[in-house]
Every structure is written in C-alpha cells, then in structure tokens.
From Swiss-Prot:
One of its GO terms (cellular component) is cytoplasm. S-adenosyl-L-methionine binds at T157, G178, D200, N243. It catalyses: L-lysyl-[protein] + 3 S-adenosyl-L-methionine = N(6),N(6),N(6)-trimethyl-L-lysyl-[protein] + 3 S-adenosyl-L-homocysteine + 3 H(+). It comes from Streptococcus pneumoniae (strain ATCC BAA-255 / R6). It is found in: Cytoplasm. One of its GO terms (biological process) is methylation. This is Ribosomal protein L11 methyltransferase. Belongs to the methyltransferase superfamily. PrmA family.
Amino acid sequence: METWQELKVTVKREGEELVSNLLIELGAQGVAIEDSMDYMGNVDRFGEIFPEVEQQEEIVVTAYYPDTVDVTVVEADLQARLAELTDFMDLGEVKMGTTALAEEDWADNWKKYYEPARITHDLTIVPSWTDYEATAGEKIIKLDPGMAFGTGTHPTTKMSLFALEQVLRGGETVLDVGTGSGVLSIASSLLGAKEIFAYDLDDVAVRVAQENIELNPGMENIHVAAGDLLKGVEIEADVIVANILADILIHLTDDAYRLVKDEGYLIMSGIIKDKWDMVRESAESAGFFLETHMVQGEWNACVFKKTKDISGVIGG
C-alpha cells in the first residue's frame, strides 16, 4: 500500500495563502487549512460576528506528499523562501512537523476540511467532489481545494467576492490580476461579466485556474494567461480585481488607472492592517477615489472608483 507524508506548518494567519501556494510549488498533492475561523459556521451575510469563538492568531497549513518525496528538503526550501519574504509579511514563528499516513488516510484527511460554504449573499463554493443542489438564486462555484491558491474561504478572498457582488451589474469586462485558483474570475462570470481576463505570474497557478474553470460550465468567457501584473496589457476594463500582497498592489495602481474605464472600479484585497495606508495612498495618487473599505480581522480590502463625480465616494 502506498504511504503518504503529512507536513504541518504552523504560521500566523496572514501567511495562509502564501504558505499554501509555496507548498504546492514544492510538490504537495493537496493542502488543507486548520483555522479556528472555519468553525464559526457558514454565513450568508458578509461581516457577521461570532463572539463565542475566539480567533486564534495562528493557523496550520497541512500539505500531503507521497513517500517518494524527501520532506526534509521541502522543509528546508520552504524555510529559505519564507526567509526572503520577512520584509513583506510577519509570519511569526514558523513551526513544521511531519507524520506518515496510509493512502486511505490521506484521501480522507484533506477532504474532511472542505464542505460547501455560502460566502456571500449569492455565491456558494462547493468542493469538486460534492453533489450540491443550489437554492433559488444561489450561484455555485466548483473548486478543487486540494490545489490550494485560494479556496474562497480566506478573508481576503471573501471580501473580494463580496466586492465583486456589489459592483458587477452585467456585461462588464473584468481583469483578474494574480488569479490563483481562478475563483474571482469564475465568480465574475457567474455575476454577469461579459469577458474576464485572468493573469498570474506563476505557471502552476495558471494551470490550476484553468482546471478549476473547466469544473464550472459556461466559463468560455474567461481567458487565462501568464502575466506580470498588468505589464503589457492593453485591454480596457470596467473592473480590475487583485487579491495579492500589499507590497505588490502598490506597483499595480498606475497601470490599473490607465486601463480602468471612467466610472470603473479597482478592487484590492490581501492587505494586512499595517499596510493599508500605503495601499490607499498609492491608489489615490494614481487618481482613484475610495468608495468602500472593508476589514475582517487583520485583513483589509477596498473598492476604488475612477470618477470625476466624488459626491458618492468616501470623503467626497
């Protein structure tokens, strides 16, 4: 019987998606997240508070590797990559540990963390292996969470989805920068966008996004390609959405202003509390006006508008 190895990485909450993505790049066949926030129950209203559950500062990212992989090498590579990112993100004290699993244990272990989750008023994320019957008006996003890159339940992704739900009215062109799992592109299509162009610098993310898009019928209007932010892009958009690190977002705002149509929107998420002012200043310097600011725990997200009429925006 084939055996598997379970590598658990304990890290501050801010590092969830970063560590998950790195583990996939380092050959993980599946990734699961253990987070106290997951036990607050699924909600159909953004921002609901559950005071009876204490939010822990740390989460555990569990990655699964076949026994042919030398996990000690993975650990060393991961530590080296994380060390390079300490200036961008406080990951806390990173702890790692490995245990062996039988194949049936691996198959059951990582899937048990994922159930259908109502993320916003309209959008529900459903694991690809689950049969789920939608209620009237409910829009279903099928994902394979085992490939990581944002399963839709992380606060940064939730706020991005909520923002898309608020600004999309139908017929828009959307640019999804740093698409990861493709979840924001899929949501944009379900919410009525006419055409979506998704970009990611990571070749693995491009492949994963395409695979997730293919799990969802009617997504022919999504185009996925490798790309470095918006460099070289000449497509005008009604909405640009980017759920990436704050230190990268500030290099996006000028190109975003160039490409967003008048009265269009720039949605940004993935911003830890200490970086919010920096991102806001970057967007406003580019010419955008802040319309919506969202906060969930340590995370910030925002909707900026390209407009000459500032009467309806914050501070206007």
